[in-house]
Amino acid sequence: MNIQISIHSAKHSNNLSEQVRRISNSHDGIILMAPTLESEDYEKVSRKLKRYPLVSIAPVDGNILPTITFDSYEGGRLAGESLIKSGFKKFGIIAGPIVKWEANLRKNGFNDVLKKNGFQIDWNYQGDYSFLSGKAALKGLQESKFNNMGIFSSNDQMALGFLHAALENNMRIPGDFGIVGYDNM
């Protein structure tokens, strides 16, 4: 059996359709990793590639195409467990986009383990999975006057933005805050 694997990058959904068309002419199947795409984008790609095997390794709402992904609920639950075991009594979340299925699962897992242990989400920032929204989250947290809080970030980009902003503000992590990201970046 002769298998070749190629990796292609499409930065924006507006050039994804063209790239998919080119790839489909020279490949036997596609494994798609595009966590920032919306359902409509997945539908377009799926329609263009009807006769090619196509699997997504990023969560996709609905039954648009076969998906192999992580257990986002369990990831959120484990993040909460880790912060509880670290001794935090106040908790916050830098949540992913509400339109993203996996972001909601991560938040639900985090919230459920907190409730099970007698805690709650005390601070919530709605992010967009970007580094800049992580930086903005720190500003929002500073305005809320919370400190010594365990924070779960729904992805590592936002966690890195939060950490970067914290260092710019001479904060200590751990110390002033603890943070757990998601994605294993």
Residue ranges and their predicted role:
Residues 1-6, 21-29, 40-185:
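Bacterial carbohydrate/catabolite-sensing allosteric modules
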Residues 8-18:
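A short, well-structured beta->alpha microelement
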Residues 32-33:
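A glycine-rich helix N-cap at a beta->alpha junction
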